Amino acid sequence: MPLPDLSTLSADQPVLIAGPTASGKSALALRIAERQGGVIVNADALQVHHAWRVLTARPSPQDEARAPHRLYGHVARGTPHSVGHWLREVTPLLSGQRPIIVGGTGLFFTALTQGLSEIPEVPAEVRARADALREGDFARMQADLGARDPETSARIDMANPMRVQRAWEVLETTGRPLARWQADTPPPLLPRSRAARFVLEAPKDWLAPRIARRFRQMLDQGALDEARAALPHWDAAAPWARAIGAPELIAHLRGEITLDAAEEAATRATRQYAKRQRTWFRARMRDWTPVPPGSA
C-alpha cells in the first residue's frame, strides 16, 4: 500500500497519527519526519515510562537518531502522569518545529483537539472507596450516582462500571457533577482543523500475527531483562506497571508461569488492547484520514 500523499501537507502543518498497537504508527511518523522535517512527539500513555523501552515498543536509539523525538521514556517509576500532565508537556512543543504527534492513547488526542475539563485529581482515599464500592456493590454505586447527580447519569452509559465510577469519584471529590465540569471545558490547544489527521487501519486478522511476531522480538531484544529490573519495585496497581506484557513477565520471573505461558498471555492481552483501541478510534475519529494496513 502507498504512503499517504504528503504533497498535500505543508511543512509546518501539525500531523496527528493514531492507531492500534503494532500497526506501524512510529514507522509512518519517522518517514514523514525524514521527508518533510518535524519533531516526533509521543502520544502513548505507556511509552512515557522510563522503565519500559522494549516492552512498550518505544523508538530505538537508532530511530531517535534519525529525527528528533520528544516525551518518550521521561517519566520515572512511581511518578504520577495523566492526560493533564501530558497536555502541559506538549504545549510548548506546538509552537516550535512542526510536531508529528503519534500514539495509541485516544484520550490524549481527544484532549489535545477538543479540550480537557480541568477536573481536580481524585484523592487516593476517594479512589479506594470507589474501587471497593464498584467491586462490592455496583448497583448501589449506580443508585447513589443517579440520585445525587441525575444530570450526569442521563448522559453516560450507566451500565459501564468505569464511566459510573468516574462520575461518582468526581462528585465525591468536588461536590460538582461531572457534566458541569465537562461543560466548562476550555478551548483545545490544537483544533482538529489545523492538523493533518491520520488513523491507521489494522484489521484483526492482519494485526494478530504482527502482535505475536513483535512480542517474540521484544523477548529477543531484552523485555525480560526490563521486567527483571522492575521486579524489586513491582506494584501491580501502579500506572507504570500497566505496560502490556509486564504482569505476565513478572509472573514468570516469580515462578508462577512458564515463559511460553507468559508469552501467550501477553500476546492475548495485546490483542485485547488493540481491539479496545480500534473501537475508540472508530467511534471518535471518523473524520480522520484512514491509512490502509501496511502503508507505513
UniProtKB/Swiss-Prot annotation:
Name the CDD domains for this protein.
NK
Where along this sequence does the record place binding of substrate? T21, A22, S23, G24, K25, S26
Q: Which family does it belong to?
A: Belongs to the IPP transferase family.
Q: Where is this site: Interaction with substrate tRNA?
A: T105, R127
Q: Where does ATP bind?
A: G19, P20, T21, A22, S23, G24, K25, S26
Q: Which UniProt keywords apply?
A: ATP-binding, Magnesium, Nucleotide-binding, Transferase, tRNA processing
- Subunit note: Monomer.
- Return the NCBIfam families for the record: miaA (TIGR00174)
One Gene Ontology term of the molecular function aspect: tRNA dimethylallyltransferase activity
**What's the Enzyme Commission number for this chain?**
2.5.1.75
Which InterPro entries does this chain map to?
Answer: Dimethylallyltransferase, IPT, P-loop_NTPase
Stated role: Catalyzes the transfer of a dimethylallyl group onto the adenine at position 37 in tRNAs that read codons beginning with uridine, leading to the formation of N6-(dimethylallyl)adenosine (i(6)A).
| Highest rank taxon of the organism | Bacteria
What name is this protein filed under? tRNA dimethylallyltransferase
PANTHER family named in the record:
TRNA DIMETHYLALLYLTRANSFERASE
Cofactors demanded by this protein: Mg(2+)
| Class of the enzyme per the UniProt entry, highest EC level | transferase
A GO biological-process term: tRNA modification
Catalysed reactions, semicolon-separated: adenosine(37) in tRNA + dimethylallyl diphosphate = N(6)-dimethylallyladenosine(37) in tRNA + diphosphate
